[in-house]
Structure formats: structure tokens, C-alpha cells
Amino acid sequence: MARFSPQDLADHLKDGLLSFPATAFQDDLEVDEAAYVEHIEWQSSYPVAGLFAAGGTGEGFSLTVEENHRVTQLAVQASSPEVPVLGSATGSTKSAIANAQGAEAAGAEGVLLLPPYLTECDAEGLYNHAAAVCESTSLGVIVYNRANAIYSPEVIARLSERYPNFIGFKDGTGNIEHLAKITTLCGDRLFYLGGLPTAETFALPLLQMGMSTYSSAMFNFIPDFALSFYADVRAQDSAAVKQKLSDFVLPYLDIRDRAQGYGVSIVKGGLKAVGRNAGGVRPPLRNLSEQDIADLSDLLATSGAGSYRLPVEVKA
């Protein structure tokens, strides 16, 4: 049974950084349970507000329903008791419902509803998709607004009015006008989190739009740096944010943008660079080249991001 009510979960998640852990794979690309458990234990040893298993960074789109359930179950079992674990619902409505119910059975506290893969649908279709998932579980549900799943402000308002367990809106578009309409309609009824790739890049300006948190992919391999960056954002220390952007984040983006699909691959490359290998990515994604990993390793060293450590009292 979930420890958090949907609203309590929303209140908890909005006040801290969010982890989206990579799913570890063996050489044959089967899930490496031992390596994944070790990664979850390490991630949840830091003061993050929540951990989203089998999300985008976790290659949820490449997991079977059974693998999704198992990965979420392992995350629940391995995570620190202080860190709530959320599952991810992907694919068709039927698949998403199976993922959501599997997450609840595994002991997760909530569910992130990802866009249905390569399926174009209108506003009513998206409403029905999200509504079906909300009806299938008692867990708090967060929708991910991105790519082929652009939820209109009216749809988000309808969902928030009808389903008490609909708790959050994750944005992966950066459309300020769209976000302003949603936050105006829904106000504090929902919590809002940034979901653009390498969300740190946009975190400070989006804070002004009510997005008090975001999904941090780089937390996977440089958690101390990621938490320090988040603290600077919440303190609205623009000078510190700009310095970290200049020193590490923007050069990191240059490596990420060398090939399509590197948004996930660079996270696993980062883990390899810091000595925490989680294996490769599943096709059709491809791994970073050896030169890309070498360049990333150099950047981690020269920027200090790879060796940055939070004060002990902050990590406690």
C-alpha cells in the first residue's frame, strides 16, 4: 500500500530534485538486476524528492510490460525508505494501464504517464488515454506533455477536475504560452515539473512559471553537482547557475547533440566515465562513441563536475 496519498505525494515531489535512473543492462541487453539495484541504492542515498523508475532515461519505451514491472519492483525494494518511487506507464492505453497497475502492485507511490509511442491522436483521445490510466489505479498520476502527446489546457483542466489522483503536469516542450494557460486554469491544484531534455538548461526561467522542480538525467552520474545546481536554481542565484551552465552544462549539450538519441546514451556514457557502468542502450538507440566518452570524461574532469562533492550536512 502506498505511504503517500496522491496530494501528499505532489506536495512532497514539488519541493526537491527528481531522479530518473538509468536501467542497467548486461552485455546481451537483458536487465542487469544486480547493477540496477546498486544504482538505485546509490541514487536514493542522496536527498532527492522522488525516483521515477523505467522513465525516459530508464528506457521505459524499450522495456516489456514484465520488465517494467520488475524494474519498478526492484526500485521500490532497493530505494531508501525516505525516497518515494514512481513507476512509468508507456505505450498504448492497454499497455499503460498494465504498467500503472503493475507499479501499484510493486509498491510504487505514483505513476508518470509517458506519450503513447508514435501514435498521433486528438485532444479527446489524449483525455481518454489519461482518464483510463487515472481510473485504473489509486496512485497519483502525472502526465508528460511532449512530442505526440500535447495536452491542451482544457484537457488538463478537465482531468484535474474529475480525477483527484491526477496530480501533476510534466512539460517537455518549453511552450511558455501553453504552460501559462495551464497554470492559470489549474493553479495549485497540480504541481508542475520541467521535462525538457537536460532540464537544468531551462530550470531558472521555468521556476518563474511555477515549475519548482525538474527531472535531472545528469543526477544519474554526477548527483552532487546536480543537487548543487538545483539549490542554486531554488535560491534564484543566477550568477551561480550561469557559471555551472558555462562550465559544464552547455559543453555537455554539445556532446549530447552530436547524434540523435544521445539524450539517453550520454547518461550511460556518463556513468561509464565516472566508473559506474550501467551497460549500453537498447536499439534503436546507439551508444556514445569512444571519442564521445573520452570528451565527456575530459569535460567532467576540467569542469570539476565529476569531482564536485556536496557538504556532508547537505547530503545527510
From Swiss-Prot:
Q: Which Gene3D superfamilies match?
A: Aldolase class I
Per the UniProt entry, the Enzyme Commission number(s) are 4.2.1.41
Give yes or no: UniProt keyword Lyase: yes
Which Gene Ontology BP annotations are present? D-glucarate catabolic process
- Per the UniProt entry, the disulfide pairs are none
Does the keyword Lyase feature in the UniProt annotation? yes
For this UniProt record, give its keywords in alphabetical order, as a comma-separated list: Lyase
Q: Which reaction(s) does the protein catalyse, per the Swiss-Prot or TrEMBL entry? A: 5-dehydro-4-deoxy-D-glucarate + H(+) = 2,5-dioxopentanoate + CO2 + H2O
Q: Provide the GO MF annotations for this entry.
A: 4-hydroxy-tetrahydrodipicolinate synthase activity; 5-dehydro-4-deoxyglucarate dehydratase activity
Say which enzyme class the record assigns.
lyase
Involved pathway(s): Carbohydrate acid metabolism; D-glucarate degradation; 2,5-dioxopentanoate from D-glucarate: step 2/2
Cross-referenced NCBIfam families? PRK03620.1 (NF002958)
Query: Which family is annotated?
Result: Belongs to the DapA family.
Can you say what this protein is called? Probable 5-dehydro-4-deoxyglucarate dehydratase
